[in-house]
Amino acid sequence: CTYLFAIAPHNRAVSAFESSAAQVRDKNSALQEEIDAAQHALDAGEAPLDVGTQDALTVAIANARLSLRVIPDMPSSTSDIESLNQPLDYSANSQALQETKAAFENSVRQLRQVTAPSQDFVISRLGQVSDVSDIQAATEEKDPNKSLNKAGSYTAAVFFHYNNLSDPDGLYSGKPSIDNGTDGGGCIEVFRTVEDANKRNDYLAVFDGASIINPGSHKVVGTVVIRTSHLLTASQQDALTAEIEAGLTAVD
């Protein structure tokens, strides 16, 4: 009777615990590999375009580490052993790690693309934006601002015409975009560093809303300043800026 009602159930519980412990070790090991891979992505030290992706990955790693089940020493009582044989599912943690790691790595690639990109890259991506035409790059001989390649200034300035620009007097139609300047549509300015791009953006902001010298909209993306004409409506500026940014940051 003692064997049937005490020893046998205990032995079964012990066997189940050992089997469960082996499964936990395997699942812990698999999740730990994903944690290590995610941590390695962070430890590489590359910054993302969207810092939120880095924060999300950091949280996912922390949550995954907290979820790892600790395998204790074998309890003595049957009831305690059975209480440890609970189902273990790391699928939610695994999915969170995979998704946040992919988003972070994609954002890192995006920032690389908009960090001192080549003039050819900017022209190529700008050419994919709807209603943009007459794309022209400034040269040292022909640059409206006379600033190309100077210390702290842009290394490329790519002007363009925007087909939806309201131009009732025909001031900009039929003229080269580089002659129209930003007023005729917009311009993409490329800088060597984020600091230089931000300085340029801050300078332009001084003239925001001015009636005579109005820089239009301007936004820093990486080391690029996206500018659109002040003659566009606010919604047109926002939509065009967003489409240009999407084109520059699209990862193949």
Listing of model-derived features with the role each one plays in the protein:
Residues R109-Q113, G185-V190, V225-T233:
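Second-shell loop/turn segments in exported
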